Amino acid sequence: SSRMTDARYAAGAWRRGSRTPSPPWEIVHALSTIMTRDRKILIKDWYEGLYELGEEEINLLNEKNERVDLSALKKEFGIEKFVLDREGVEAIKARTYEPTANIQGMVSGYTGPGHKTIVPNEARVRIDFRLLPHMNPQKCIEKVKKHLIDHGFGHLEVIAFDAAEPPYKISVKEDISQAIIKAAEEVFGEKPVVNGVSAEGTILKHVWMPTVLTGFANPGANLHAPDENIHVENYIKGIKYAAAIMENFSKE
């Protein structure tokens, strides 16, 4: 999260619009140095030591591409195309193996009804970066701060939240992975589609234990959204799925 505060209060643009710094414009200019329109992150050494895909990962991406209906996914999202017109394996790969720089929200000034010509005295933006294995969250935070300083934005206040989670990855060959695959086939009649998350990384950096986060929600469940939902059928199958995972894992 970054913030810039300039004056003690917002003032009319006619009084100081051409003479004083504009916090929202400073934020906009700073953001433009972070990522290009083709999604390349410009922070120095951001891709240093980036995880390289092996034969196992490439084969799994191809298999996943054959099973995921990207057209249905676009319809669910309400979009006509993915970023950079990606399709097929490239779209699947981007979801799992590409670092991101996402703007969650921006706040500044007045956007209400009527006329008001002010220069806001403060602007805030909240950004999240999704990392891949071998990328250290703390080092990445320092890279962001240094990037802003090097580009003339050292006056921006950068607040890094403590909830940064280290990325991690396990092989599909692990016992727990195989148990989940078998359980999904038994309960749902097909292999699971597992997308990358790193919630467990906070624990696993202290005590390593192969872990997989898997779900059973229905398409359109809108996880984490105000209208998050689950069908009763999926809820019941989820109970059976959890039991099948434990049973299969005990046999591995």
What are these regions (language model features)?
Residues 1-4, 12, 16-74:
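Polar, glycine-rich mid-to-C-terminal structural blocks
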Residues 1-8, 215-220:
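Short, small-residue-rich loop/turn micro-motifs
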Residues 6-8, 16-17, 129-137:
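A generic structural motif
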Residues 28-33, 124-125, 242:
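Active-site-proximal alpha-helical segments within enzyme catalytic domains
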Residues 34, 38, 145-154:
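A common structural junction motif
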Residues 44-122, 130-143, 151, 155-252:
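An extended, acidic, His-containing surface patch that forms the Zn2+-binding/catalytic region
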